[in-house]
Structures are given as C-alpha cells and as structure tokens.
C-alpha cells in the first residue's frame, strides 16, 4: 500500500496551532487544488474533544468560507482528522499559509460570538448523523485556546521524516 503524504511528516516536531500546506495538485483542466493541515493540537500530547470537534465541524467550514473564499479561492471541504488533532481543508486556489491563518483566527472569533446551541447549523436528526453529540461550550473553549495561542506555520521541509524511520 502506498504511503500517504500525511504520514511522511514527523508528528513529533509539529507545532500547533499551525497551518501547513499538506498537498498541492492540478486538475486535468488546470485548476490548482491545495490541501491544508489545520493543526489545532500538538500530536500525541493534546486532543480535541468529540463533542467539541463535532460542533466545530458544523461551524468552522461556514466561517472559513466567509473569510477565505474569493475570486481565486473556493473551499471544497473542511473535515476533521481521525486523530482529532485538527482539520484538513481542501480548496481550489493557492492562498498562502498566512491568509489561511488569518481566516482561521477570525473564524474562531465568530465561534465565540455564537450565543446558544440553537445557532449551530444542521443540528437536527435529518442533517447530522449524531446530532445529540454536540457542545457549543467545548467548541468555544477550543476557539478561545486557538485565539490565546495564535496560529503559526508548519513547513513540510522542516517536518520530513528520515528515510530510516519511513522504512522501519
């Protein structure tokens, strides 16, 4: 089985919160697609709560679209990582890490501005597979933590795993 790009970086050296360009590719028609690693937590040291990450999933994508989409950028998807340390964001376009970090911070402030759980979009049994597993309070705690710590930038060249580790 081929090794996925996300497993070629050393998770012990990742900073968080931080943005990383995980992958870039071009469609057959020439559109640029960029996948970002939006790392909320230091891998193997911190983890996002289940209810908090689920509520973030419902809120974060909409707010990021509000602040990042433009004539050159369109977000395709923002999905939580299985390890619960962040999200992957796939988009059409090539914004830089700083633009993404700024949109992320503004989105976290937007989450703090939500007054009650009724404002969470798609929070019902028809549109959500586990609609009872949400916590606005936990999502807001995560957002506050991001705003308090700030968002840095992780570079792939600083995180590449040594070939000996890849083959062990």
From Swiss-Prot:
UniProt cross-references to InterPro entries, sorted A to Z: LuxS_sf, Metalloenz_LuxS/M16, S-ribosylhomocysteinase
Cofactor binding notes: Binds 1 Fe cation per subunit.
Any single GO BP term: quorum sensing
Keywords linked to the UniProt accession: Autoinducer synthesis, Iron, Lyase, Metal-binding, Quorum sensing
Record field: catalytic activity: S-(5-deoxy-D-ribos-5-yl)-L-homocysteine = (S)-4,5-dihydroxypentane-2,3-dione + L-homocysteine
Major enzyme class: lyase
Cofactor(s) this protein cannot do without: Fe cation
EC annotation from Swiss-Prot or TrEMBL: 4.4.1.21
Positions bound to Fe cation: 54, 58, 128
Pfam families linked: LuxS
Xref: SUPFAM superfamilies: LuxS/MPP-like metallohydrolase (SSF63411)
GO-annotated molecular function: iron ion binding; S-ribosylhomocysteine lyase activity
Superkingdom as given in the UniProt entry: Bacteria
Stored HAMAP family: LuxS
Assembly behavior: Homodimer.
NCBIfam families assigned to the protein according to its UniProt record, in alphabetical order: PRK02260.1-2
Protein task: Involved in the synthesis of autoinducer 2 (AI-2) which is secreted by bacteria and is used to communicate both the cell density and the metabolic potential of the environment. The regulation of gene expression in response to changes in cell density is called quorum sensing. Catalyzes the transformation of S-ribosylhomocysteine (RHC) to homocysteine (HC) and 4,5-dihydroxy-2,3-pentadione (DPD).
Family: Belongs to the LuxS family.
Record's protein name: S-ribosylhomocysteine lyase
């Amino acid at each position: 089985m081929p090794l996925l790009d996300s497993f070629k970086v050393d998770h012990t050296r990742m900073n968080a919160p931080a943005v990383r360009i995980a992958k870039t590719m071009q469609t057959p028609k020439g559109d640029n697609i960029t996948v970002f690693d939006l790392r909320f937590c230091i891998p193997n040291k911190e983890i996002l709560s289940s209810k908090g990450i689920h509520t973030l999933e419902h809120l974060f994508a909409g707010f990021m679209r509000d602040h990042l989409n433009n004539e050159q950028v369109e977000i395709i998807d923002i999905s939580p990582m299985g390890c619960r340390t962040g999200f992957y964001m796939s988009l059409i376009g090539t914004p830089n890490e700083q633009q993404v970090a700024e949109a992320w911070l503004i989105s976290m402030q937007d989450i703090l501005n939500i007054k009650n759980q009724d404002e969470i979009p798609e929070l019902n049994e028809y549109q959500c597979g586990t609609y009872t597993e949400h916590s606005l309070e936990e999502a807001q705690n995560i957002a506050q933590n991001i705003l308090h710590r700030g968002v840095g930038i992780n570079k792939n060249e600083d995180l590449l795993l040594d070939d000996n580790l890849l083959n062990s």
